[in-house]
Design a protein with these regions (language model features):
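Pepsin/retropepsin-fold aspartyl endopeptidases
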Residues: 11-283
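Bacterial N-terminal signal peptides
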Residues: 1-9
Length: 283
């Protein structure tokens, strides 16, 4: 998950070409989606598809290979730190028949990403994905661009949030409720790059409190985190049972209370144009 704040005139508006068709993807560790993309007519290159990343990211070697011009800098916020990176301009990024042009891309080594998905050369973020309505089918390992919306409950998503007093864009924020305890609905980021549901430390400016107040048994996780076992999450009328939820102690917080992994649904239709998702749509 990357949250990018562009600090120069490098904020580039993607120009859209009409996409059609299905694209197959590789599923790593049962949750990470890796697709093949061409960039500036070169490739294909392996990219991690990450709805939790606000911007597309490429590694320095790919930037050099593409001769991508640097157009500014961007502040890259991850769940562990904040750093400044260069931003390049990509003439075109294409997945299957779906393409966006004049896309800004952060240049970053992506060390943590490459540990989880060896061989990837970049991350396709929401600045690219938000140009399309997308169906992700984890069972069939296919994605469809700009197909008709399937039947099913439409759960509202917010594509803008707030972080450190600034408006964030290219987001997929959705309300979810943890049924095991009281606390009401929380706004979580729908994240294809997340393995487990995760709650961040409570911020002073957070409008939502964490649902757990010692009422659930938990075990100690990695890095001092707490893992709440056998939780039930409700999104709209969709219930997801028996999931483990990480309560993180990471120092960096975001515009959402936590992360909601997309893979916990067998499929999902994301309508960026309509501002809704359909969870587990019928075939």
């Amino acid at each position: 998950m990357f949250l990018v704040t562009v600090s120069s005139s490098a904020a580039l508006a993607a120009q859209i070409q009409q996409p059609k068709g299905l694209v197959s993807f590789d599923l790593r560790d049962k949750y990470l989606i890796v697709v093949e993309a061409t960039v500036n007519g070169m490739g294909p290159f392996s990219f991690l598809l990450d709805t939790g990343s606000t911007h597309t990211v490429i590694d320095p070697n790919l930037a050099r290979q593409l001769h991508a011009p640097v157009v500014g800098e961007a502040s890259l916020t991850t769940v562990s730190d904040v750093r400044m990176d260069k931003m390049a301009r990509l003439k075109e990024v294409r997945v299957g028949d779906s393409a966006a042009s004049e896309l800004g891309a952060v240049i970053d080594k992506m060390d943590q990403v490459k540990l989880k998905a060896p061989g990837v050369r970049g991350v396709l973020g929401e600045d690219f994905l938000s140009q399309f309505d997308i169906l992700l089918d984890y069972k069939k390992r296919i994605m469809r661009f700009d197909g008709a919306a399937p039947a099913g409950e439409r759960c509202r998503i917010e594509t803008m949030g707030h972080y450190r007093g600034l408006t964030t864009t290219n987001r997929l924020l959705i309300e979810a409720e943890f049924m095991d305890v009281s606390g009401g609905k929380l706004q979580l980021q729908l994240d294809t790059g997340a393995k487990m549901p995760e709650l961040f430390p409570v911020r002073n400016d957070s409008i939502s409190a964490h649902p757990w107040a010692g009422s659930m048994a938990f075990s100690s996780g990695l890095n001092g985190t707490s893992i709440h076992s056998h939780a039930t999450i409700r999104i709209g009328t969709t219930m997801v049972h028996d999931v483990d939820v990480v309560q993180s102690r990471r120092g960096v917080a975001f515009d959402a209370v936590g992360l909601l992994p997309v893979w916990i649904f067998k499929s999902i239709y994301i309508s960026h144009t309509g501002g809704f998702v359909v969870l587990n749509p019928a075939d």
